[in-house]
A protein has these predicted regions:
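Alpha-helical transmembrane segments and their membrane-interface boundaries
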Residues: 2-55, 139-142, 146, 153-173
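Transmembrane alpha-helical segments of multi-pass membrane transport proteins and ion-pumping complexes
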Residues: 21-33, 67, 71-79, 96-108, ...
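Pore- and pathway-forming membrane helices of multi-pass small-molecule/ion transporters and channels
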Residues: 22, 37-54, 97-103, 107-136
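Structural signature of hydrophobic alpha-helical transmembrane segments
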Residues: 29-43, 81-97
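Membrane-interface helix caps and helix-loop-helix hairpins in membrane proteins
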Residues: 31-34, 56-57, 81-87, 106-113, ...
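Alpha-helical membrane segments and adjacent membrane-interface helices in multi-pass membrane proteins
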Residues: 41-78
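Cytoplasmic-side transmembrane-helix entry/capping segments in multi-pass membrane proteins
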Residues: 60-69, 90-93, 113-122
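Hydrophobic alpha-helical transmembrane segments in multi-pass integral membrane proteins
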Residues: 75-85, 128-142
Length: 173
C-alpha cells in the first residue's frame, strides 16, 4: 500500500479540504474583479454559513434566498434610516427592531424556502458594506454583493465540497 492509501480518513479529509479551500476560493478572488465585482470576500462569509449548516446541497437554494433577502433588507434599512428624521440612534434601533422582527417572522414561517440565519447574515453583510453610504451612492454594490453571495454558496460551498469528494474518491480507487 502506498503512503496516501494508508492515511487515516480524518487526515485525508483534512488535507483534501485544505487543498480545496486553497485552490478554489482564490480563483473567485482573482476573477471576480474582472466581472466588476469588488465584494468578492463576501463569498467566503457565505460559504462559511453554508458549511456550518452541514454542506447540505438540499438547503443551498433557501440559504441563497436568505442571503439575497438580507441584501435587499440592507437596502431597505439604509433607505428607511435616510428617510426618517429622528435621532440617529432611535432611527437605527427602530429600523433594526422592525426589519429584524419581520425577517424572523417571515423566515421562520416559511423555512422550506428561506434559511433565516442566512437572511440575518446577509443583512449584516449588506449593512457593513453599504451602511456608510447614501442610498443614491450604492450604485451596483447590492448586485455585486448578491453575486458574491451566490458564488459563496454555489461555487465555494458546493464546489469545494464536490471537489473534495471527487479527490477522495479518486485517491481511494
Amino acid at each position: 500500500m502506498s503512503g496516501i492509501h494508508k492515511m487515516s480518513d480524518k487526515k485525508l479529509n483534512i488535507l483534501t479540504l485544505a487543498f480545496g479551500i486553497a485552490l478554489l476560493p482564490p480563483i473567485w478572488a482573482v476573477l471576480s474583479p474582472y466581472a466588476g465585482i469588488t465584494t468578492g470576500a463576501v463569498a467566503l462569509i457565505c460559504a462559511g454559513l453554508y458549511v456550518a449548516n452541514g454542506n447540505k446541497k438540499e438547503d443551498a437554494l433557501k440559504i441563497t434566498i436568505g442571503f439575497l433577502l438580507g441584501d435587499l433588507w440592507a437596502i431597505i434599512a439604509i433607505w428607511v434610516m435616510e428617510t426618517l428624521q429622528f435621532n440617529p440612534n432611535v432611527e437605527l434601533y427602530l429600523t433594526l427592531f422592525i426589519l429584524g422582527g419581520l425577517a424572523g417572522l417571515i423566515g421562520e414561517n416559511i423555512p422550506k424556502y428561506i434559511f433565516t440565519p442566512a437572511w440575518l447574515c446577509g443583512w449584516a453583510i449588506g449593512l457593513t458594506i453599504m451602511g456608510p453610504l447614501s442610498i443614491d451612492s450604492l450604485g451596483t454594490l447590492p448586485i455585486q454583493i448578491g453575486a458574491s453571495m451566490i458564488a459563496g454558496v454555489i461555487y465555494v460551498g458546493i464546489g469545494v465540497d464536490a471537489f473534495q469528494k471527487f479527490i477522495i474518491k479518486t485517491i481511494k480507487k
